[in-house]
Structures are given as C-alpha cells and as structure tokens.
Amino acid sequence: MLDDGTLKVEGFKSTDEGVAFWCSVDGLEIYHAGDLNHWYWDGEDPQWNKNMAKAYQEEISKMHGRTADIAFLPLDPRLGEYFYLGIDDFVKEVDAKRIFPMHFWGEYDVAERLKKMPCSAGYCDRIVEIHEEGESWEI
C-alpha cells in the first residue's frame, strides 16, 4: 500500500496477470480490476474453474462493504455465457456507483447484454455503456 497523505493506493492479487488497484484521492474511491476477475472458461478443467472462483472471491472479499465511486471491471465476451460472473460477484461484495466495463474486445454490446440479464436488476443502472474506443465521460 502507498499512502502519501493525498493519494492512497492499495493493490490486490490478480487471478491472471498483474494486480488490481483501489485508489483513494480527493474524496474519490476508484477501483481498477486489471485482470482480477472470475475467469470461468468453458472446457477448462472443472477444478481449475472452481479454484479460480475461490481465488476471485478471496480477493474481492477484502473489499467487502466498501463503496467505489468508479469501478473498472472485466466484462469479457470470450468467456461465453459466463462473461458476467466477475461483475456480478463484485457487486455482491462492493458497492459501485458507476461500473465501467473493460476487456470486452470491441464487442460494445456486451454491457447492454448484461443489463438485460435478470441477475443485474439491482445494478444495471450503474453500468456505463461504452460505444466506441476513445469515448470519455465527466464524473
């Protein structure tokens, strides 16, 4: 953890490569998952998928009860029908005011697909739909 009095950065172990970051700055709480996700690959060994789910849950449980003003979370269509698991698990542990999907490989409709799923009923209004590369928002 880095805390210089203005910026506080906490790192979390990834379930793939790199790390995830929780940044606190100027009264804002910003979470960037990087590759920390519930990776469930169809065709992968069932025990591997089970271990991945456990590892993801262990990391996000460290953030239990916190509120992120902005959360950047993987929503990867390569996972097929399981593309939404990471976001769905995350919002059960952490309140996120705005969710920015990432890792969607140019499939811009993936957020819209999640928003139509019954599991997202409690948070679909917080998912930001991204329509093109380079799009920007003011929060």
Q: What does each of the following model-derived ranges do?
A:
Residues 13-18, 77-80, 105-106:
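Short beta->alpha connector loops
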Residues 56-61, 80-89:
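A short, acidic, amphipathic alpha-helical segment used as a generic capping/interface helix at domain edges
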Residues 31-34, 51, 70-76, 98-105, ...:
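Active-site neighborhood of phospho(di)ester-bond hydrolases with catalytic His/Asp-centered motifs
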Residues 41, 80, 109:
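Conserved protein kinase catalytic core
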Residues 1-67, 131-139:
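Core dinuclear metal-dependent hydrolase active-site scaffold
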Residues 1, 83-139:
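Binuclear metal-ion centers of metallo-dependent hydrolases, dominated by the metallo-beta-lactamase
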Residues 15, 36, 72-77, 111-119, ...:
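Noncatalytic linker/hinge segments flanking ATPase motor cores
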